[in-house]
């Protein structure tokens, strides 16, 4: 599953006005929430068609039930193993007489008894069963075996089981089949078998689609819903005759009319390979497609709304899919396992994308690309998300993790090799370099907290769906990607690929744990006689079984290296023990005065080597191209030499390492390892820098300063400094783009141009402010002809709305409502949060929970856009505090990301009062709980304490530095 805005100018503290508006927002949004809750209450699952006294449901909490009973535990017992399923589903795309959208289905599961048992436990969620002889299922033997009679069946809601109690025991090694007929709601909750809606002209269209990961296949049909319970699936869909049915495999033949109703067709699909339930997909829609046959014979199709396909929005995805599939087939030394690769863009989809085997589902903005209206960053997102999902077709689908505690291996691997696949499809973009900014530094911000967690968690600690959901975080995706990139680097890509191919060949159609990969990589190392300080397993266990990462400190006067666990707050209490005592086996790469040196391994807390000692004006720099997952600190003299080199000729240092110098120093300053002025001094050379990565590293690092100080007197001098530094970059792009009429050829230059405009406008460069307001005014005068290049729209929209008022906001809102391309709608939706008008933000916040105005899948990100605006943060925080219980109860199982919301709304917290509010918020809502936001709340408390300390220590010196250096 794939991972995946601009902030307006500050207005300072608005005091009483903010409080009054927040109360208004609370009242307005409470009404919206009540409406949504009532709608949800009226949309509960349909009643059983044949109710019976013996068909009981157990609603008690699993924590209060007898844990000695297998059905009260979240993990399936090992007594039964599924072999195959026959599933028929019929979604109704118009509401019934109760106003509900429903689907009906039947299922036959064949399973083998591995241990004698008198109970069948299978997952089932929100399904209502048709009773047969008083029971929800019919059981029969296969191959002459005789099944015991059924005593009773029950639904255990807390653990989401259908439990079949038997009067005798199933026989070990015997096969059985179990039939059921059921009905469920085709809800708009973005989970399991659900419905998505969109407008085609003035007509509302409905799509039946799926999202099974992690634990929602059970919401579509009864199944053994764990990744290790692989089986073959025979899917049949009954659907309106004018619609198309899709699933993981191709149809066996043309659809045939349903005998009892010719308005319906029956589509039967070929049997799937042995696979996990979470990778199943089935879709009924009137979508259209474009297709081509790959050189290896695989059928490639891109599906989307007919108007999007007709406009050519699927063409780019079609053109890159074949090359990416071929790349991974070569990279894995394994042919693509299926006869076709369907990819479909859905109007409503909670994740960025989902790697369903042979039928990958996407948000529209992750698959569709319009060259006339989409930006280069939109194009980059499409190619990288496609590469991520196609990487999973082998790593994750063909070979699958045993249990979700190793999710990081699935998602971390795909998050790493997505850059390789995308780079193959777009070789001139240098996409592999972006991983440092997008993943390595992104996750280090979280992994430097005492509340972080290791990549690999013991299986016994991950049981409930909520615990599984918490694993889909930056650690699993981005740290997983970062340490695998480091592993590939010190092994060499060829050795890494050899071990990977062996792993895939050995475990095809099976399940693994992470140690299996280490063992196969070790075999490849042994075959190549590569010298490592110890085994792959020993090295990687340090990076996967303990949280965090080291900071390597270099004393160039002696050549001494030392390592310690890097914590943003060095006084924080690390309560999680580590068998390795937070010592890592670290691959060290380095350059001296621009010349690369031999590689080195730091295996102890401290070591000495002449590679790292200098004399005269020599400087040394560690972690070449940031292939290692660690930060680097130097003695004061070496820092001074690096700064001198940057200001004299920054090109002597590789561009990625120029970004590293900035990012490491700011984080070291946050951790009290270096003075904050040292980190700020590392940005002085930017007045001469034109490359994207160093500037992005600086802006990203300084965004923390903005969060801490945009409500204080520091912010004025800070803006003046940024204005001074960015003006040459702004002028450079103005002159080299014919006064913004042309776009730079190089992708990184295009991104740098956007940074130049965004930074110049938000920090008061008059020419920039005039440019964006002029372009936006031209568009307002002629709405049918947008003069703003797609690359520049996000920043122009945001800054123009920030400078404007109600007229500009209402125009942008109207354009958003009429946008037919999701990428354009996304740009406008984010920019609408840039307003300086409190009442406008208040109104916009009230829109976010009306799905007729803001799609459910976009509600969280829209609220986050508002809270990222200094003016809107108070509105959102007041609302979250006052309405958490309602928010959690109404949306806890749906499309809200509580983790992202908590992280965003607390990002500016830096006062004792805000800490007290946060602690009170936790106390007040302990009974309600925080779901997927539980860990985020603990991290928010830790970050707030660190912020308070940092501001107290640094405010005055930062104010002085910006004042002196902005002249």
Curated annotation (Swiss-Prot):
<dbReference type="GO" id="GO:0008237">
    <property type="term" value="F:metallopeptidase activity"/>
</dbReference>
<dbReference type="GO" id="GO:0070062">
    <property type="term" value="C:extracellular exosome"/>
</dbReference>
<dbReference type="GO" id="GO:0030667">
    <property type="term" value="C:secretory granule membrane"/>
</dbReference>
<feature type="disulfide bond">
    <location>
        <begin position="761"/>
        <end position="768"/>
    </location>
</feature>
<feature type="modified residue" description="Sulfotyrosine">
    <location>
        <position position="176"/>
    </location>
</feature>
<dbReference type="Pfam" id="PF01433">
    <property type="entry name" value="Peptidase_M1"/>
</dbReference>
<feature type="glycosylation site" description="N-linked (GlcNAc...) asparagine">
    <location>
        <position position="818"/>
    </location>
</feature>
<feature type="glycosylation site" description="N-linked (GlcNAc...) asparagine">
    <location>
        <position position="128"/>
    </location>
</feature>
<dbReference type="InterPro" id="IPR042097">
    <property type="entry name" value="Aminopeptidase_N-like_N_sf"/>
</dbReference>
<keyword id="KW-0037">Angiogenesis</keyword>
<feature type="binding site">
    <location>
        <position position="411"/>
    </location>
    <ligand>
        <name>Zn(2+)</name>
    </ligand>
</feature>
<feature type="active site" description="Proton acceptor">
    <location>
        <position position="389"/>
    </location>
</feature>
<keyword id="KW-0735">Signal-anchor</keyword>
<dbReference type="GO" id="GO:0016285">
    <property type="term" value="F:alanyl aminopeptidase activity"/>
</dbReference>
<keyword id="KW-0675">Receptor</keyword>
<dbReference type="GO" id="GO:0005615">
    <property type="term" value="C:extracellular space"/>
</dbReference>
<feature type="topological domain" description="Extracellular">
    <location>
        <begin position="33"/>
        <end position="967"/>
    </location>
</feature>
<comment type="function">
    <text>(Microbial infection) Acts as a receptor for human coronavirus 229E/HCoV-229E. In case of human coronavirus 229E (HCoV-229E) infection, serves as receptor for HCoV-229E spike glycoprotein.</text>
</comment>
<dbReference type="GO" id="GO:0030154">
    <property type="term" value="P:cell differentiation"/>
</dbReference>
<feature type="glycosylation site" description="N-linked (GlcNAc...) asparagine">
    <location>
        <position position="625"/>
    </location>
</feature>
<dbReference type="GO" id="GO:0008270">
    <property type="term" value="F:zinc ion binding"/>
</dbReference>
<feature type="modified residue" description="Sulfotyrosine">
    <location>
        <position position="424"/>
    </location>
</feature>
<dbReference type="GO" id="GO:0005793">
    <property type="term" value="C:endoplasmic reticulum-Golgi intermediate compartment"/>
</dbReference>
<feature type="glycosylation site" description="N-linked (GlcNAc...) asparagine">
    <location>
        <position position="681"/>
    </location>
</feature>
<keyword id="KW-1015">Disulfide bond</keyword>
<keyword id="KW-0031">Aminopeptidase</keyword>
<dbReference type="InterPro" id="IPR014782">
    <property type="entry name" value="Peptidase_M1_dom"/>
</dbReference>
<dbReference type="GO" id="GO:0006508">
    <property type="term" value="P:proteolysis"/>
</dbReference>
<feature type="binding site">
    <location>
        <begin position="352"/>
        <end position="356"/>
    </location>
    <ligand>
        <name>substrate</name>
    </ligand>
</feature>
<dbReference type="GO" id="GO:0038023">
    <property type="term" value="F:signaling receptor activity"/>
</dbReference>
<dbReference type="InterPro" id="IPR045357">
    <property type="entry name" value="Aminopeptidase_N-like_N"/>
</dbReference>
<dbReference type="GO" id="GO:0004177">
    <property type="term" value="F:aminopeptidase activity"/>
</dbReference>
<keyword id="KW-0217">Developmental protein</keyword>
<keyword id="KW-0945">Host-virus interaction</keyword>
<feature type="binding site">
    <location>
        <position position="392"/>
    </location>
    <ligand>
        <name>Zn(2+)</name>
    </ligand>
</feature>
<feature type="modified residue" description="Sulfotyrosine">
    <location>
        <position position="419"/>
    </location>
</feature>
<comment type="subunit">
    <text>(Microbial infection) Interacts with the S1 domain of human coronavirus 229E/HCoV-229E spike protein.</text>
</comment>
<keyword id="KW-0325">Glycoprotein</keyword>
<dbReference type="GO" id="GO:0002003">
    <property type="term" value="P:angiotensin maturation"/>
</dbReference>
<comment type="similarity">
    <text>Belongs to the peptidase M1 family.</text>
</comment>
<feature type="glycosylation site" description="N-linked (GlcNAc...) asparagine">
    <location>
        <position position="573"/>
    </location>
</feature>
<dbReference type="GO" id="GO:0043171">
    <property type="term" value="P:peptide catabolic process"/>
</dbReference>
């Amino acid at each position: 599953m794939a991972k995946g805005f601009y902030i307006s100018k500050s207005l300072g503290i608005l005091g009483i006005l903010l409080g009054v508006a927040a109360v208004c927002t609370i009242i307005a949004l409470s009404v919206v929430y009540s409406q949504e809750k009532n709608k949800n209450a009226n949309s509960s699952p349909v009643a059983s068609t044949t109710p019976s006294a013996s068909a009981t449901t157990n609603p008690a909490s699993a924590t209060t039930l007898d844990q000695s009973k297998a059905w009260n535990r979240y993990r399936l017992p090992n007594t039964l193993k599924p072999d195959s399923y026959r599933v028929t589903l019929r979604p109704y795309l118009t509401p019934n007489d109760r106003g509900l959208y429903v689907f009906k289905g039947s299922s036959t599961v064949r399973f083998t008894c591995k241990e004698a048992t008198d109970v069948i436990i299978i997952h089932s969620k929100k399904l209502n069963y048709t009773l047969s002889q008083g029971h929800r299922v019919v059981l029969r033997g296969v191959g002459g075996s005789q099944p015991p009679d059924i005593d009773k069946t029950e639904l255990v809601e807390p653990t989401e089981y259908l439990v079949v109690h038997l009067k005798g025991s199933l026989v070990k090694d015997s096969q059985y089949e179990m039939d059921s007929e059921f009905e469920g709601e085709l809800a708009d909750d973005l989970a399991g078998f659900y419905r998505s809606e969109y407008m085609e002209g003035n007509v509302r269209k409905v799509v039946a689609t799926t999202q099974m990961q992690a634990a929602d296949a059970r919401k579509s049909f009864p199944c053994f819903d764990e990744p290790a319970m692989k089986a073959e699936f025979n899917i049949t869909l009954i659907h309106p005759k004018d619609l198309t049915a899709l699933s993981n495999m191709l149809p066996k033949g043309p659809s045939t009319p349903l005998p009892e109703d010719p308005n319906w067709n029956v589509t039967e699909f070929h049997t799937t390979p042995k696979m996990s339930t979470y990778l199943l997909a089935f879709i009924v829609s009137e979508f259209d497609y474009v297709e081509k046959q790959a050189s290896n014979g695989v059928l490639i199709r891109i599906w989307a709304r007919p108007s999007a396909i007709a406009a050519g929005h699927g063409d780019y995805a079609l053109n890159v899919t074949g090359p990416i599939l071929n790349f991974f087939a070569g990279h894995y030394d394994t042919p693509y396992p299926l006869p076709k690769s369907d990819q479909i863009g859905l109007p409503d989809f909670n994740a960025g994308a989902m790697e369903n085997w042979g039928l990958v589902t996407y948000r529209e903005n992750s698959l569709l690309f319009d060259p006339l209206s989409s930006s280069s960053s939109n194009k980059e997102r499409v190619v990288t998300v496609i590469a991520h999902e196609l990487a999973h077709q082998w790593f994750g689908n063909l070979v699958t993790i045993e249990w979700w505690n190793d999710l990081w291996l699935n998602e971390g691997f795909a998050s790493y090799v997505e850059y390789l696949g995308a780079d193959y499809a777009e070789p001139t973009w240098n996409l592999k370099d972006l991983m440092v900014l997008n993943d390595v530094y992104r996750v280090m911000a979280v992994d430097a907290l005492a509340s972080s967690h290791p990549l690999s968690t013991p299986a016994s600690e991950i049981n409930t769906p909520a615990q599984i959901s918490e694993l889909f975080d930056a650690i699993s995706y981005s740290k997983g990607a970062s340490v695998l990139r480091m592993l590939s680097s010190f092994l060499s890509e060829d050795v890494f690929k050899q071990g990977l191919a062996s792993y895939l060949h050995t475990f095809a159609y099976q399940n693994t744990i992470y140690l299996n990969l280490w063992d196969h990589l070790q075999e490849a190392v042994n075959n190549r006689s590569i010298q490592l300080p110890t085994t792959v397993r020993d090295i990687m266990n340090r990076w996967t079984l303990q949280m965090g990462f080291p900071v390597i400190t270099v004393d160039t006067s002696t050549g001494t290296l030392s390592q310690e666990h890097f914590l943003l707050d060095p006084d924080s209490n690390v309560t999680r023990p580590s068998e390795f005592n937070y010592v890592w086996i670290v691959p060290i790469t380095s350059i001296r005065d621009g010349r690369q040196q031999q590689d080195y391994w730091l295996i102890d807390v401290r070591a000495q080597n002449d590679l790292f000692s200098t004399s005269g004006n020599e400087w040394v720099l560690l972690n070449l191209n940031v292939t290692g997952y660690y930060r680097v600190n130097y003695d004061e003299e070496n820092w001074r030499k690096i700064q001198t080199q940057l200001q004299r000729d920054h090109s002597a240092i590789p561009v990625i390492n120029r970004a590293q110098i900035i990012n490491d120093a700011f984080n070291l300053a946050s951790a009290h390892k270096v003075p904050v002025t040292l980190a700020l001094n590392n940005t002085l050379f930017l007045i001469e820098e034109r490359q994207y990565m160093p500037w992005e590293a600086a802006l990203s690092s300084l965004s923390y300063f903005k969060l801490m100080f945009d409500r204080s007197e520091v912010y004025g001098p800070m803006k003046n400094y940024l204005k001074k530094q960015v003006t040459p970059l702004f002028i450079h792009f103005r002159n080299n783009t014919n006064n913004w009429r042309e776009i730079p050829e190089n992708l990184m230059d295009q991104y740098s141009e956007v940074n130049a405009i965004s930074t110049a406008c938000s920090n008061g460069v008059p020419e920039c402010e005039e440019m964006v307001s002029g372009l936006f005014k031209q568009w307002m005068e002629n709405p049918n002809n947008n003069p703003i290049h797609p690359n520049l729209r996000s920043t122009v929209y945001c800054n123009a709305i920030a400078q404007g008022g109600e007229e500009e906001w209402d125009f942008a809102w109207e354009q958003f409502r009429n946008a037919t391309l999701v990428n354009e709608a996304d740009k406008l939706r984010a920019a609408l949060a840039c307003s300086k008008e409190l009442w406008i933000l208040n109104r916009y916040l009230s829109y976010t929970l009306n799905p007729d105005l803001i799609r459910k899948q976009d509600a969280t990100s829209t609220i986050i856009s508002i809270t990222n605006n200094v003016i809107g943060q108070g509105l959102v925080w007041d609302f979250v505090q006052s309405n958490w219980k309602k928010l959690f109860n109404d949306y806890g199982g749906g499309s809200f990301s509580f983790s992202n919301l908590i992280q965003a709304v607390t990002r500016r917290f830096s006062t004792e009062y805000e800490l007290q509010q946060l602690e009170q918020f936790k106390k007040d809502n302990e009974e309600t709980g925080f779901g997927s936001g539980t860990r985020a709340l603990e991290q928010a408390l830790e970050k707030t304490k660190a912020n308070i300390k940092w501001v107290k220590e640094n405010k005055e010196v930062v104010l002085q530095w910006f004042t002196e250096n902005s002249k």
